[in-house]
Amino acid sequence: MKKTLIALAVAASAAVSGSVMAADWTEGQPGDIIIGGEITSPSVKWLWKTGEGLSSFSNTTNEIVKRKLNISVPTDELFLAAKMSDGIKGVFVGNTLIPKIEMASYDGSVITPSFTSNTAMDIAVKVKNSGDNTELGTLSVPLSFGAAVATIFDGDTTDSAVAHIIGGSAGTVFEGLVNPGRFTDQNIAYKWNGLSKAEMAGYVEKLMPGQSASTSYSGFHNWDDLSHSNYTSANKASYLSYGSGVSAGSTLVMNLNKDVAGRLEWVAPVTITVIYS
């Protein structure tokens, strides 16, 4: 959405009294009185972080069986994390704050997540030889993921809370990152993005003084429908976050399209594109 400044000019006659700012005195006709200002979108932005620990695996050709190589991941490794720079008070929709994620392999081919549960997905990434850029095959990457939301509804002490979230359907938050229509686990989000329930609550509590977001809420908030009040209500404050990664003990599976001998370096880059609406 394009951010636009809007000005309004009005021609009028007026009587001036009291202490005011005024132009110089003129003879005859007083001329135009300019009334104007600006309208801007909130300064809230999405912040993103990508993992750096998935690029130093070391294996031998002896581990390849029928052109398949299993690659063990010994420690938790971040894949992608996201959080808002601040909470937003008022209507959420219409502020270019709804992120849709598209992933692609090195050649631009689309990576479509295969969701295996409400907290897990696999992605198939093309692999190439770093030396001559020839394709080597595909790499299956298992990811755990979660998303979280903190919301204060004005005057509502029941549902004002830090909660699990349902999203991911077309046009809604986290499209391409969560299983559409299935609630996610906020605790998995915190594992990967480093936030806490208290921090989530703090972002909205400072926008709604005197009101609080419960951190013991066990339910979920519905962000899977753009007509829902979570998107349209002006009487609330919201803050969202996301996280995904490869859990310790997981296995990446490389399916090679050719035999490999000697030494080579491989790479399976994932290009992340965020589209805001």
From Swiss-Prot:
Coiled coil: none annotated. It comes from the Bacteria. It is found in: Fimbrium. One of its GO terms (biological process) is cell adhesion. The keyword Endoplasmic reticulum does not apply. Residues 1-22 form the signal peptide. Keywords: Fimbrium, Signal. Pfam families: Fimbrial_K88. InterPro entries: Fimbrial_K88_FaeH. GO terms for cellular component: pilus. Belongs to the fimbrial K88 protein family. Fimbriae (also called pili), polar filaments radiating from the surface of the bacterium to a length of 0.5-1.5 micrometers and numbering 100-300 per cell, enable bacteria to colonize the epithelium of specific host organs. This is F41 fimbrial protein. It comes from Escherichia coli. The gene is FimF41a.
